[in-house]
């Protein structure tokens, strides 16, 4: 499927709205769609405030998380930078997602990332994400230790045929992808699909072997329930 065809089919198949946070157009979008929105883009408030509004317009977290589910969160925690730098996903947003998952009935909420350095404990802490996740009842899980990864086939891959995938990403009840949207030197942007690189062990192989194609290949097999872009 060509990019243009994908965009057209996605737009036709989903109820979507891109609106200012204070706008009153959501009701019109919902009425036109006849159902909760599938795609919402918001601007003009904090990440947490926009998530609160957006998830409500999509039918609430209960649409995605059911009672007894084990939920896995995959934010971007790659860098040893504080929240104000914006290198990682907003920690307040991640903490709020944990809270909403438990309110929807989740049994547990687990959070991980394969960070861009072996000092993952420090990056979890410095990003502010560990503190917010744990304060809301979630658990941080090691993302860099090789024993946490298992070989997986990528049947539809063109460049990437196999990968060592983090066990939490393999087949969770609910997988929530929470990237931060940024410019990237190699991929031009880093967002939802590139955030999957934190699910695999050997990222350097991707960099050496057509990284954009590897990103697309891995996306063919990663089960994702909900994507929340900071």
Describe the residue ranges of each PLM region.
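N-terminal and secondary-structure boundary signal
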Residues: 1-230
């Amino acid at each position: 499927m060509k990019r243009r065809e994908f965009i057209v089919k996605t737009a036709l198949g989903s109820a979507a709205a891109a609106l200012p946070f204070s706008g009153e157009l959501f009701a019109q979008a919902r009425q036109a769609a006849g159902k909760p929105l599938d795609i919402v883009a918001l601007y003009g408030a904090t990440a947490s405030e926009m998530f609160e509004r957006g998830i409500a317009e999509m039918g609430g977290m209960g649409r995605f998380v059911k009672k007894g589910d084990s939920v896995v969160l995959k934010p971007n925690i790659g860098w040893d930078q504080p929240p104000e730098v914006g290198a990682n996903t907003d920690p307040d947003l991640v903490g709020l997602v944990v809270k909403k998952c438990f309110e929807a009935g989740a049994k547990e909420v687990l959070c991980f990332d394969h960070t861009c350095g072996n000092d993952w404990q420090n990056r979890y802490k410095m990003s502010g994400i560990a503190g917010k996740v744990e304060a809301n009842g979630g658990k941080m899980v090691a993302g860099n230790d090789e024993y946490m990864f298992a070989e997986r086939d990528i049947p539809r891959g063109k460049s990437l045929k196999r990968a060592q995938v983090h066990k939490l990403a393999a087949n969770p009840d609910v997988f929530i992808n929470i990237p931060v949207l940024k410019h990237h030197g190699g991929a031009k942007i880093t967002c939802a699909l590139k955030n999957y690189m934190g699910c695999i062990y050997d990222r350097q192989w991707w960099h050496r072997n057509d990284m954009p194609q590897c990103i697309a290949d891995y996306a063919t097999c990663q089960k994702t329930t909900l994507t929340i872009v900071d």
